[in-house]
Amino acid sequence: MLKDGLFTRFPRPAFALSLHDDDTMPAGTIGYHPGFFRSMSDAVTITVYGRGGHAAMPHNTVDPIVLAARIVLALQTVVARENNPVDPVVITVGSIHGGTTGNVIPDEVRLQLSVRTYTADVRARTLAAIRRIAKGEALAAGAPREPQVEAPERGNAPVYNDPALTARLAGALKRGLGEDRVIEMPQKMTSEDFAEYGLAGVPSVLLHIGAVDAVKLAAARQTGIPVPAPHSPEWAPEREPTLKGAIRAEVTAMLELLRVN
């Protein structure tokens, strides 16, 4: 919408407010965090090339599946050994595609990564490390050509909740919904393109709405088995209390922002 000229075709808003469902809080509970709240995200694709052949004669091939496996493991050393632990990084390989059947070694394998960081410097170092590891492992494996690493020039920006606006809304929500229904949350490594409104100069706040039955959440904490999270096919928010809590929170926030002192 912003790229399509939202703020030139229509008046620029005084504030931007958003709600996102959450699997860590009881349904209807509101969570907030001032300052940086959600991370940057980058979608990275690595294609590694080998020399395919018969599965019974791997000595005549350069196996890109083994090469891909080495890369997957080596990437975690970026998180564990190259990055300062106080500057969080997540590298997840969420998809690997290679081959068509069990008795054929393929010519190539494609890996799809999700990379999460908070600062531009850490992001740049992490993406450079991914390229270095992919190329280094391919060289060590004797691959016939360098891997192809595709990364965006600019991924999703981090969500920054305007501290003054966050404090104002948190106070209004606590008065309207109750102190026990509004809690301060830690930062998360998930991302959200709502950040673009803040980058456009609009004071903005992203709030979370708990969407899990309180009894189920308590049981999950007791057993250590987490409830299904967003992006899981089993994610099923408690509809009525979640919607009611979200509506009450939005209305309360709107009334606060529209209030004339």
Predicted features along the sequence, with ranges:
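Histidine/acidic-residue-rich, glycine-tolerant segments that coordinate divalent metal ions
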Residues: 1-96, 100-106
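Metal-dependent amide/peptide-bond hydrolase catalytic core
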Residues: 69-261
